[in-house]
Amino acid sequence: MTKVETRLEILDVTLRDGEQTRGVSFSTSEKLNIAKFLLQKLNVDRVEIASARVSKGELETVQKIMEWAATEQLTERIEILGFVDGNKTVDWIKDSGAKVLNLLTKGSLHHLEKQLGKTPKEFFTDVSFVIEYAIKSGLKINVYLEDWSNGFRNSPDYVKSLVEHLSKEHIERIFLPDTLGVLSPEETFQGVDSLIQKYPDIHFEFHGHNDYDLSVANSLQAIRAGVKGLHASINGLGERAGNTPLEALVTTIHDKSNSKTNINEIAITEASRLVEVFSGKRISANRPIVGEDVFTQTAGVHADGDKKGNLYANPILPERFGRKRSYALGKLAGKASISENVKQLGMVLSEVVLQKVLERVIELGDQNKLVTPEDLPFIIADVSGRTGEKVLTIKSCNIHSGIGIRPHAQIELEYQGKIHKEISEGDGGYDAFMNALTKITNRLGISIPKLIDYEVRIPPGGKTDALVETRITWNKSLDLEEDQTFKTMGVHPDQTVAAVHATEKMLNQILQPWQI
């Protein structure tokens, strides 16, 4: 018998629960831009963007987002977390222009008694008052059962009575949160299944937390039990270990269940980068789906297998997410790794040169030196007996910055046998350097790629004289939707000088007519 494919709703909680990540606070414009991207490009079904009554600034932010949403007919896809506090939350939401209240109720007897000091009967009366007032105010209501995961395990009768009470109210959905991230997949199935068996007509959704790194697995079991929606955040932002990561959740749903979502997979990477930049929380290189290294093969045997029929490919293809497969260079590289990188550079090597390049790459890897695809032309020139000299050399760079002075830079570079000098100011030392450099390159008709990312890596240990590694990502395409990115790296005890070295490498990369 063929199973019927179900379509699940996804509520993105990046802007509300995700903002509870330590050190994360989105500005109004950042929240607006993220909300636009989530709803219009990533195509999440709904977004939760704020908690009611947090601050005047938060009210103004919600008002801005709702003004935009009204012009796009998206107001009912935007939701606000609210509280059982009489008419206060509802009035706040009315003032904000929002149309949907996600009411936070107590999903365990322990929370109810210890935090509120009320009986279930008293609390249910309070909940009903808020719901009735919200409906009269023209709002739609969903209900969170906070700490439900502990509630159904330790006070099941209370949970049953609360859901029974809510089943008689005019609400849209009931949310089942694993607030403290304590559930196993088996427990998730049991808890969700027990409610859906008794209340099959209620729209239940599961809200996971990742304390045991089980939130995606728990979500799969919630699907198996029959939930109609799931909650997630971009990059897994959230309290403690975070919420269920949307990128991994959606991919797993599409590949490992009989369900689908409305999510546009190819926009996942861009959503991840957007939130990474605005949150200031870098994602790890090996984070599934969106990490920098997850579509990179390091072992030479893998590159060889891919070349001979994609022997090491899996269903998580990079093209699904707007990305490309790459092959790392180092002591584990093989000829296939080298040839694939050379091919991407638009070059063809003889077997003799290819072998020499491989030997040099392995030698550098043994010395614990990072080799990037952008280094290959220089290595090829060297092993081929060519000079591999720089086309452009930064002869000197004096950068001054400090407290009470405007940063400024004076640079001197040599290009095609001529010396070029320039002075400029900037918002920082490197910005002043780039402003001076741009004046020169504009005169020379050289177009500088757009700087996409600037990353500084300092080794642990706290030594003030430690070598700093600065990696800069550039995009050669004026159309940022087109991926022509490449990285250059500089190493120096001074962070800004390391960035200058990385920039010099970038200039030689775009100016060198490599033809080996």
Curated annotation (Swiss-Prot):
Its UniProt pathway annotation is:
Amino-acid biosynthesis; L-isoleucine biosynthesis; 2-oxobutanoate from pyruvate: step 1/3
Tell me what the record says results from L81A: 4.7-fold increase in Km for pyruvate and 15.7-fold decrease in kcat
Task: Kindly give the CDD domains that the UniProt entry links to this protein.
Answer: DRE_TIM_CMS (cd07945)
Q: Where is the active site?
A: R16 (proton donor), E146 (proton acceptor)
The conditions that induce or repress this protein are given as: Expression is repressed by isoleucine but not by leucine.
Coiled-coil spans are none
Changing D17N has the effect of: 4.4-fold increase in Km for pyruvate and 480-fold decrease in kcat
One Gene Ontology term of the molecular function aspect: lyase activity
- Write down how the cofactor binds this protein: Mn(2+) is the most effective activator, followed by Co(2+), Ca(2+), Mg(2+) and Ni(2+).
Q: Altering P493A: what's the impact?
A: 1.5-fold decrease in Km for acetyl-CoA and 2.6-fold decrease in kcat
Q: What is the effect of changing E146 to D/Q?
A: Minor effects on the binding of acetyl-CoA, but causes a strong decrease in kcat
Write out the residues that bind pyruvate: R16, D17, Y144, T179
Does this UniProt record's set of keywords contain Isomerase? no
Q: Which UniProt keywords apply?
A: Amino-acid biosynthesis, Branched-chain amino acid biosynthesis, Isoleucine biosynthesis, Lyase, Manganese, Metal-binding, Pyruvate, Transferase
Q: How is its activity regulated?
A: Regulated by the end-product isoleucine via a feedback inhibition. The binding of isoleucine has inhibitory effects on the binding of both pyruvate and acetyl-CoA. May act via conformational change of the dimer interface of the regulatory domain, leading to inhibition of the catalytic reaction.
User: Where does the Pyruvate carboxyltransferase domain start and stop, copy by copy?
Assistant: 8-269
Annotated EC? 2.3.3.21
Q: List the catalytic activities from the record.
A: pyruvate + acetyl-CoA + H2O = (3R)-citramalate + CoA + H(+)
Changing R16 to K/Q: reported impact?
Loss of activity
- Assembly: Homodimer.
As for family, the record states:
Belongs to the alpha-IPM synthase/homocitrate synthase family.
What name does this protein carry?
(R)-citramalate synthase CimA
Give the originating organism: Leptospira interrogans serogroup Icterohaemorrhagiae serovar Lai (strain 56601)
